[in-house]
Structure formats: C-alpha cells, structure tokens
C-alpha cells in the first residue's frame, strides 16, 4: 500500500511541476518541467534523506558520544523488530525530532539538543518510539520525498515571476496571469499535499509508538512539552525550510507564519487525548516495554558532540 501511495505522490508532484511549467513557458516549459521532475524524483529517492539531515546540520552519534540516548533508540528498535537506524542530533533549542530514509534498512532518526534538555528519558523514549513507528510503517520515504519536491515546487512558484514574468513572452499561453497563478497555486498545492499525508499518519505512529515503548503516557507527556516549546522557541532552520515541517513530531514552524493556517499536523490535544484513552482502556502491548535509563532524572545537558553546550563543558546528566 505504501508503494502505491508513494507512486501516486510522485505522479501528482510530477503533474504539478508540469502544470507550473506550462503556465510559465507553454508546451516547451511543460516538457522541460517534466524532465526536471523526473530527475528530481530519481534524485530524491536516493538522496532526499541526506538533504534533510544536511539542512539541519545534523551530526551522527553513537554509543561513544551519546551512550544513553543511543541505547534508548537501540532498545526501542529491538522491541519493534527493526534494523538499528542511524542516530543523529541537530543543534536547536526547540524540542523536536524527525525520521527519514527510503526504507527501514536505510533509515535515520534525529532529535534536537533542545529535546534532550527538556524531556525526561521516558519521554525521549516515547518520542523516538513514535519516529521508529514511522520507519516501520514506511512513512519516511513518502515524508522525505514530499519535503524535497514540495520545497522545489514552492521555490519554482516563488521564482515564477523571474522565469516567466515577461509580458511579451510568446511561450506563455496565459501571459502574466499564468505566472501569477503559478506563484499562488504551486506553493498552496504543495502545502495541501503535506496536509493530506500527515493527519492519519501521525495518529497511526502515535499508537504504534506507544506499543513500542510500552507506555502511551510517556509519549502523551512528551507531546505536550514539545508543543509548548515549539510555540515559544523558534527553529530557524525549519523557518528557512518550511517544506520539511510535516516530517517533525510537532509542527516546528512558529505561530506567526501563515503556513500554520494549513497545519501539517493534527491537533496536539487530540493526539494526547487519544494516547490517554489508550492507556486507560488497557493497551494491548505487542512488545515488552523499554526501560528508560535513569528514569527519575530529567535531562540537563546534551551528549558531547560539539552541539549545544556539550562541546565545551563535561557532559552531565542522563545523556553523558
């Protein structure tokens, strides 16, 4: 089913790219757009995960420089029956996390330094279990390709004026009106695609993540903290790359952005309520619960990776 969904997504994005090309340059523009879209589809399948990780300057960590964080992900992956993903940290005060990769064998999970500072180990386990659920459900390919192509489509729409704004351009069948339509429709359509693939996907990952970590309340508590943090702490890299917003566990964009009129995520309170109902109703756990390291302690520092505060001071707390 995921292969069909991904194929439909690629077909829609390609058609949208061709439509914008037609509005800008007529048939010639449409054919050029088709060639570009085909190349981007191929490139994004193999490289979009690296592009996303690079956009957030994420650094890979292991048991040497982030032993307890790495151990939590390792134990959760074992519970889920997944291959061990690559583990990354990116430097941002906003608590958040995402997963990427074209399949479970080539997957990665990334957490912000702010996440490790703000959440308890149990809550971190809930968050990473949610991200592993995306990997297990094979959502990451769809998420990552959408981020890459949506960003490209939005950029093409934003620069449509420069490519096709010449009123005397005979290749443009609709003239300046066509350019204006491309500038408005392309980013909006890309945004709607992100919305369409995010809603049910997040609920499904919440439920499976709760099963993987063994306690829905860990994830419920984490979602509340992350949502409050995202509302007050900006993520500058996400603001520069809004097409990646749907990849995060909570929308990283500030409330001041117009993009939030078309939220890429379901309401956080509804997600928390669903997890609480799951806990109260007696969760059918299919895997043994993970035991979070130092469960009574809150994170006060980040691993010694050179990110955040961990590079200059000896690390303290559960992530050292």
From Swiss-Prot:
Cysteine disulfide links: none
Active-site residues annotated for this sequence: 131
Annotated binding of Zn(2+), by residue: 130, 134, 202
Single GO BP term: proteolysis
Chain segments carrying region Disordered: 281-320
UniProt GO molecular function: metalloendopeptidase activity; zinc ion binding
Cofactor note: Binds 1 zinc ion per subunit.
UniProt entry keywords in alphabetical sequence: Cell inner membrane, Cell membrane, Hydrolase, Membrane, Metal-binding, Metalloprotease, Protease, Transmembrane, Transmembrane helix, Zinc
Transmembrane segments: 6-26, 28-48, 145-165, 173-193
Membrane topology of this protein: Multi-pass membrane protein
Entry's localization field: Cell inner membrane
InterPro entries: HtpX_protease (IPR050083), Pept_M48_protease_HtpX (IPR022919), Peptidase_M48 (IPR001915)
Pfam families listed in its UniProt record: Peptidase_M48
Family: Belongs to the peptidase M48B family.
Designated name of the protein: Protease HtpX homolog
Organism: Rhizobium leguminosarum bv. trifolii (strain WSM2304)
Lineage, highest ranks first: Bacteria, Pseudomonadati, Pseudomonadota, Alphaproteobacteria, Hyphomicrobiales
Gene: htpX
């Amino acid at each position: 089913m995921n292969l069909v969904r991904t194929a439909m997504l690629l077909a829609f994005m390609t058609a949208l790219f061709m439509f914008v090309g037609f509005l800008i340059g007529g048939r010639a523009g449409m054919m050029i757009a088709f060639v570009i879209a085909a190349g981007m589809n191929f490139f994004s399948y193999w490289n979009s995960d690296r592009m996303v990780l690079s956009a957030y300057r994420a650094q890979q960590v292991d048991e040497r420089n982030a032993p307890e964080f790495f151990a939590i992900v390792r134990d959760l992956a074992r519970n889920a029956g997944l291959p061990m993903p690559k583990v990354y940290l990116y430097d941002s005060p906003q608590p958040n996390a995402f997963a990427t990769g074209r399949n479970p064998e080539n997957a990665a999970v990334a957490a912000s330094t702010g996440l490790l500072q703000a959440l308890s180990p149990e809550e971190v386990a809930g968050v990473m279990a949610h991200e592993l659920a995306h990997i297990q459900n094979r959502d990451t390919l769809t998420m990552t390709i959408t981020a890459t192509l949506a960003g490209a489509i939005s950029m093409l729409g934003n620069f449509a004026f420069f490519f096709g704004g010449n009123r005397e351009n005979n290749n443009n069948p609709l003239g300046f009106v066509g350019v204006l339509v491309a500038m408005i429709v392309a980013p909006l359509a890309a945004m709607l695609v992100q919305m369409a693939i995010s809603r049910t996907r997040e609920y499904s990952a919440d439920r499976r993540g709760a099963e993987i970590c063994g306690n829905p309340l860990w994830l419920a508590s984490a979602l509340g903290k992350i949502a409050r943090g995202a509302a007050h702490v900006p993520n500058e890299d996400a603001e520069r790359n809004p097409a990646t917003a749907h990849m995060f566990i909570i929308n990283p964009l500030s409330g001041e952005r117009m993009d939030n009129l078309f939220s890429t995520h379901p309401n956080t309170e509804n997600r928390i309520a669903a997890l609480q109902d799951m806990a109260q109703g007696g969760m059918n756990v299919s895997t043994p619960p993970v035991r979070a390291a130092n469960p009574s302690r809150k994170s006060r520092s980040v691993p010694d990776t050179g990110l955040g505060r961990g590079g200059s001071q000896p690390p303290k707390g559960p992530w050292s």
